[in-house]
Design a protein with these regions (language model features):
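Bacterial Sec-dependent N-terminal signal peptides
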Residues: 4, 15-48
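Intrinsically disordered, low-complexity serine/threonine-rich segments
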Residues: 6-8, 30-31, 71, 344
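Intrinsic-disorder-associated, low-complexity terminal segments enriched in Asp/Asn/His/Tyr and depleted
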Residues: 9-10, 14
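A sequence-level/structural motif corresponding to short, flexible coil/turn segments enriched
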Residues: 35-395
């Protein structure tokens, strides 16, 4: 996150320090380049794996201020990418081969962290808006609805008056409205994980917050078949002692259960999906070395299994997880490793890609598309990238 506070406001300075720490944490102390196969002469061969195509998009002179946080498949077989360039919200629509069809820039001082195509063919996206009127100005949640061409139908920013608020994920619910999750009322020390529901015209329907410690955040969100909501993130303190956090709420946002677990070192969840048997599988990092972490909770919130890969080097966490059509799960982590596991999280294969570490998608033919790229060297941006490969080449 690129919050740029100045003007001598202490709370803003605290928030800047907090978000600098969050960038280091959530985007993984990134002082490396995602690995390339040094022995491959073919640029579409990565660690011996044929990559069917690789597309990159650049909107700044050296990509240093380009960000891409989320990639989703669209109903026409193409893809939608959410991010920012030069601190301006960005959506990119591609065809099924990853070629750009259009892009749209939005309000200055915005970043889009999540996007999904919705039932009318348009898109819902969310992130934050950082106003540039100082002093007395704090980051707010930004929510944006576009048509199928990316033109704005409505957008709005909202939050607490004197503290910081931002959204990490958004979904369309079964009734055609939208729910977001993220952080609410962050003063640099205390914060709340939140769920907020908005109508399909942008009106607030309800808002709920959840805490298990002084600092709490929601990172990812899903709706269950019966209409309940699952959010995952962390609960702990602003500057360490992170515990993985999962909340189940009903369709009105009322808490059904809330689970926070202590661990050796920090633990945090970035992504969640439904297990085919009805449980909830979440991914993130664990322990003081911030290695990759998976766990499953059943519908009552009890842990079915968990895997903290402490024998691995520090991969700094899985950022996305999806069920595999052949059983098990696909994941992408901070160091650009695409991993497949079985149904209980045991690794089947793991291969290092390049320039992609945020989102993973399985296509109808079994191919995998991976895209999005978090902060790189010196907490700057990087190439906005998306690639397609055949995972059977490494199974």
């Amino acid at each position: 996150e690129q919050f740029t506070f100045d003007g001598g406001n202490n709370k803003k300075k605290d928030m800047k320090m907090k978000n600098n720490l969050m960038v280091i944490l959530i985007f993984s102390f990134i002082s490396f380049h995602c690995g390339e196969d040094k022995n491959a002469s073919d640029p579409y061969l990565v660690n011996g794996i044929p990559v069917k195509w690789l597309r990159t998009f650049s909107f700044s002179s050296d990509s240093s201020s380009d960000e891409s946080w989320c990639v989703r498949q669209t109903s026409d077989g193409g893809f939608i990418i959410a991010g920012a360039t030069d601190y301006t919200g960005l959506l990119i629509k591609t065809d099924s081969n990853g070629e750009e069809e259009w892009h749209q820039l939005f309000n200055n001082s915005t970043t889009l962290y999540s996007v999904r195509q919705v039932s009318d063919g348009g898109f819902i996206a969310t992130g934050y808006f950082e106003c540039d009127t100082l002093p007395g100005c704090y980051p707010d949640i930004y929510l944006l609805k576009t048509n199928s061409s990316g033109s704005i139908e409505w957008d709005q920013s909202f939050g607490t008056d004197d503290n910081n608020d931002w959204a990490r994920d958004v979904i369309e619910t079964q009734d055609g409205h939208f729910v977001i999750t993220g952080t609410w009322d962050d003063d640099g020390w205390n914060s709340k994980a939140m769920l907020r529901k908005y109508s399909n015209t942008g009106s607030l329907i309800w808002g709920q917050t959840f805490t298990s410690s002084v600092a709490n955040e929601g990172n990812s969100l899903m709706e269950t078949p019966e209409g309940s909501l699952i959010l995952v993130g962390y609960s702990g303190t602003q500057h360490g002692a992170y515990n993985h956090f999962m909340v189940k709420a009903n369709s009105d946002g009322q808490q059904i259960w809330k689970k926070k677990n202590e661990s050796v070192g920090d633990a945090l969840l970035y992504a969640v999906c439904e297990d085919p048997d009805g449980g909830y599988v979440a991914a993130g990092f664990c322990n003081s070395w911030r290695t990759n972490f998976l766990l499953e909770r059943n519908e009552s919130g009890n842990i079915e299994w968990q895997n903290c890969f402490i024998e691995e080097s520090s991969n700094y966490g899985y950022y996305d997880i999806i069920p595999s059509s052949g059983g098990g799960y696909y994941l992408i982590d901070d160091l650009c490793y695409l991993t497949k596991t079985d149904e209980t999280g045991n690794i089947i294969f793991s291969v290092r890609l390049k320039h992609v570490n945020q989102s993973v998608i399985e296509l109808d033919d079994g191919d995998i598309v991976v895209g999005g790229f978090g902060f790189r060297e010196g907490n700057t941006g990087g190439p906005i990238s998306i690639l397609r490969l055949d995972p059977s080449k490494v199974e």
